[in-house]
């Protein structure tokens, strides 16, 4: 009997050790959510989602996905009225299977825009095209996308509106048309304006965007959030908290860091950004723009939390320690 008890004890101990060794690694998303935020996410598309190593990190560490390219206009409506959703469907299905939130990106942007849209000069035609595109894309994923970047990069560095086919043909009214159409298409989705270089409170682009959003909200335009892309240079993190406060003061219900990457990926810079979001109550989440430097649009600058071999960097551990 003594031998059986000893054997039972050994088996129990062994099983506990095995279970412990198979536990998922620490998750930045889980730690961030435990601090009261909605998500810590990343961007991807079918290529990176079908990579086993990359996908494994996403499943373990990130709670939200943004399509890097598959929901942009050139991907979803390359020819007028002829929609293609294979890439976007893949991401949406992956997110549903793995319980990840989705930020839809992006409905109206001057870049990655098909030439047939860029060539429109008639107001009524462009209005109709804009409404049809937004409605068709959003209806396909209605109830599945937490937030949409409705308009993307519509400001110049001095805080004025950028020249684009949308602004040149419709004037500032394209913003109202886009947001009202989006609200009608999916009333439950959070509707965002998204831009880059919103990293300092007193910078012209930051104040100009915030002032425009305040005015538009006062006019009844349904803007819920501002997304700050936060593509930073090394050492560029010190102004992020102040900038988020400026954006939050515009009257939106939430702000988010939407495309984070930092040249050199220093622990100090990454922790500064994470703490900025934690300290700004309206900041609901952070999305880093990729998993591994291997797939980053800035790969030469090593800006992400995992290196080219998918190994976590010191900044990854620093974030977990800060949380």
From Swiss-Prot:
The gene is xynF3. Gene3D superfamilies: Glycosidases. Optimum pH is 5.5. Retain 85 percent of its activity in the pH range from 6.0 to 7.0 after a 12 h incubation at 25 degrees Celsius. Transmembrane segments: none annotated. InterPro entries: GH10, GH10_dom, Glycoside_hydrolase_SF. This is Endo-1,4-beta-xylanase F3. It comes from Aspergillus oryzae (strain ATCC 42149 / RIB 40). Its EC number is 3.2.1.8. Belongs to the glycosyl hydrolase 10 (cellulase F) family. SUPFAM superfamilies: (Trans)glycosidases (SSF51445). Optimum temperature is 58 degrees Celsius. The purified enzyme showed complete stability under 60 degrees Celsius. Residues 1-23 form the signal peptide.
